[in-house]
């Protein structure tokens, strides 16, 4: 099998978009492929209509694909060379797309004022490490916070952190779980295992624990996983998480994903994405408190990255594509739609205008993680293999498998993919 085909197979196995082909629209036509919630679909439809009105003769075709079928659809379009001018992509897969030659930098195409307005975390999720070019941009970013009930925590005499630097230590976190269990909580914490392995959740939400404890999925200088993912620090991190499950502290996968704010609040804490805030707030009101992720090592580490927009390298009119993205990201109605759904800001101006994330807002501390503790998932072309291997390893570890064996197997799979692709030059330390 050719090297590139092996890469495509790995990406498909990881349920990831692999390639963005060379389909190009005419100068007066733009094609945009995306996935999203109903409010996002409506917002983009409105944007397209108003952009067409502002640019007579231009047609914007929106290719809306359900999230679960997105990668399959994209793969089919790639195989026929019929791909969009503008495409939405999940941030950690950007390195693969750029390495494959399917994206072009957005700098010089999107308004510079928007680029200057990006948060550091937003810049990192759209940047390709070898040339440090910015290849994608979005209005939003993402994070994971630790949610709790202020009344419940105060009643149990568990302190509530007031800054990222003030995050709970590992000892405080595990003591809180024990205390909450003893005080009657059915489950001290929901890690949202109910999301399963068909999403990025395991890598997205749990890799920060490894990073906080001083290890990683892969060495980001040599780009080798063996010796890093199977290091003692990572084994200790995986063993720690396995212990939480064995102690009965974690909501089981079979219980679903809303035990923190369900009736009776079976779960005392929630290790949840920023999107959990809106639903939990509706159920809990002002009793809801958002806290930073714990410091399992020297400092707290949080994730970032979400669905962002890039421009096909082969589009017939890259300037028009850039104009559309600028129009979209500057649009007040578009921003309002995301504000109403607690979109996590990727632009500083969007954050300042958000009552949830602005200074002293209920999620201001979670937003602070974007500049103080956010670390992107490994920006490497082998990421589809990296995330698939880690997801499977952690699933097995949660189910009782030996952490050292599972992490070693995962590291071997990752390094084998990189070796099969000649190191994904210019990556690698050789």
Residues of each region from the PLM?
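Helix-loop-helix "hinge/cap" segment bordering the ligand-binding cleft or interdomain interface
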Residues: 53, 57, 128-201, 216-251, ...
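Conserved C-terminal helix/tail region of periplasmic/extracytoplasmic solute-binding proteins
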Residues: 59, 243, 373-430
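Extracytoplasmic/periplasmic substrate-binding proteins
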Residues: 35, 202-213, 235-317, 323
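Extracytoplasmic "Venus flytrap"/periplasmic binding protein-like
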Residues: 29-31, 46, 50-121, 136, ...
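C-terminal lobe and pocket-closing loops
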Residues: 276-286, 296-392, 425-430
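Hinge/lid segment of periplasmic solute-binding proteins
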Residues: 91-145, 202-205, 289-294, 356-359, ...
């Amino acid at each position: 099998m050719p090297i590139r085909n092996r890469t495509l197979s790995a990406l498909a196995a990881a349920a990831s978009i692999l390639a963005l082909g060379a389909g190009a629209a005419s100068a007066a036509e733009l094609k945009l492929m995306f996935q999203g919630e109903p409010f996002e679909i409506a917002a983009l439809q409105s944007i397209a209509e108003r952009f067409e009105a502002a640019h007579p003769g231009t047609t914007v075709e929106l290719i809306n694909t359900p999230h679960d079928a997105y990668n399959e659809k994209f793969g089919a379009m790639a195989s026929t060379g019929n791909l969009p001018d503008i495409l939405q992509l999940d941030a950690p897969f950007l390195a693969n797309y750029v390495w494959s030659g399917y994206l072009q930098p957005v700098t010089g195409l999107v308004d510079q004022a928007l680029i200057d307005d990006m948060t550091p975390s937003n810049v990192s999720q759209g940047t390709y490490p070898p040339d440090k070019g910015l290849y994608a941009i979005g209005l939003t970013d993402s994070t994971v916070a630790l949610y709790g009930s202020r009344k419940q925590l105060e009643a149990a005499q568990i302190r509530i952190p007031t800054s990222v630097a003030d995050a709970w230590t590992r000892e405080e976190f595990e003591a809180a779980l024990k205390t909450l269990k003893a005080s009657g909580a059915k489950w001290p914490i929901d890690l949202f295992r109910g999301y399963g392995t068909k999403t990025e959740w395991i890598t997205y939400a749990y890799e920060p624990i490894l990073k906080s404890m001083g290890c990683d999925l892969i060495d980001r200088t040599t780009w080798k996983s063996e010796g890093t993912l199977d290091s003692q620090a990572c084994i200790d991190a995986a063993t720690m998480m396995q212990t939480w499950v064995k102690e009965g502290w974690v909501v089981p996968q079979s219980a679903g994903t809303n035990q923190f704010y369900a009736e009776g609040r079976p779960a005392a804490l929630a290790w949840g994405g920023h999107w959990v805030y809106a639903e939990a707030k509706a159920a809990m009101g002002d009793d809801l408190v958002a806290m930073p992720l714990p410091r399992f090592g020297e400092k707290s580490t949080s994730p970032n990255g979400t669905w962002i927009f890039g421009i096909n390298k082969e589009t017939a009119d890259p300037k028009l594509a850039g104009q559309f993205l600028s129009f979209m990201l500057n649009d007040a109605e578009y921003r309002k739609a995301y504000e109403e759904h607690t979109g996590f800001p990727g632009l500083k101006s969007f954050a300042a205008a958000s009552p949830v994330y602005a200074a002293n807002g209920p999620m201001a501390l979670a937003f602070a993680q974007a500049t103080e503790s956010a670390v992107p998932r490994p920006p490497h072309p082998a990421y589809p293999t990296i995330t698939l291997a880690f997801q499977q390893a952690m699933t097995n570890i949660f189910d009782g498998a030996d952490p050292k064996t599972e992490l070693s197997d995962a590291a071997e799979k990752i390094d084998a993919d990189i070796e099969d692709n000649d190191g994904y030059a210019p990556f690698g330390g050789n």
